[in-house]
């Protein structure tokens, strides 16, 4: 059963109010965190790069993935029209813990290491303020879990299975945090943010 069906404009997550956690570098990159409240996920799929954030709090529809897919020469499928026919599912559960959006490329080892892992800079920064912060993930298309190399990497970084939750469209998340890419965010050609080498 659905509770809402309507067409809404899509906004980039960092076109709304954010908090800057690292100043802009010489290539125009900076690290920001966006906070979104009363969130449910919608979109073509729950798998990267398809999820959209719908905020019950302010009725915004938000694109959390701002990446250029170099092999395709474009961004996500939403970026042609920047609107979507929203179909919000009935809420079956509430997630009270703050969650950090981490639905990025975990299917390809190179992209996971180079593009996806740097998103964790924002996660670890925010975990200082929100010790119970969870990492919100989604498995690759056609899978029901993350690949072992992802879990192994999390373990090396001190992220346990208890720190990770899987995205569910029937869950309402009280607070979702979205962080900047250190290699994308509309700047796929310039060198990555220097923080990536820490």
Can you name each region flagged by the protein language model?
Residues 1-196:
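The feature primarily captures lumenal catalytic ectodomains
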């Amino acid at each position: 059963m659905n509770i809402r069906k309507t067409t809404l404009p899509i906004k980039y997550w960092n076109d709304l109010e954010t908090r800057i956690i690292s100043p802009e570098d010489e290539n125009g990159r900076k690290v920001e965190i966006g906070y979104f409240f009363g969130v449910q996920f919608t979109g073509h799929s729950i798998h990267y790069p398809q999820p959209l954030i719908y905020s019950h709090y302010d009725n915004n529809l938000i694109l959390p993935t701002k990446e250029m897919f170099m092999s395709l020469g474009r961004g996500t499928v939403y970026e042609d029209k920047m609107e979507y026919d929203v179909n919000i599912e009935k809420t079956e559960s509430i997630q009270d813990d703050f969650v950090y959006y981490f639905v990025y490329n975990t299917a390809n080892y190179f992209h996971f290491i180079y593009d996806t892992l740097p998103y964790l800079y924002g996660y670890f920064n925010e975990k200082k303020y929100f010790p119970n912060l969870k990492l919100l993930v989604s498995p690759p298309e056609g899978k029901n879990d993350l690949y072992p190399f992802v879990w192994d990497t999390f373990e090396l970084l001190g992220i346990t299975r208890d720190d990770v939750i899987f995205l569910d469209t029937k869950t309402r998340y009280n607070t979702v945090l979205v962080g900047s890419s250190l290699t994308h965010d509309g700047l796929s050609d310039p060198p990555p943010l220097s923080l990536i080498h820490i």
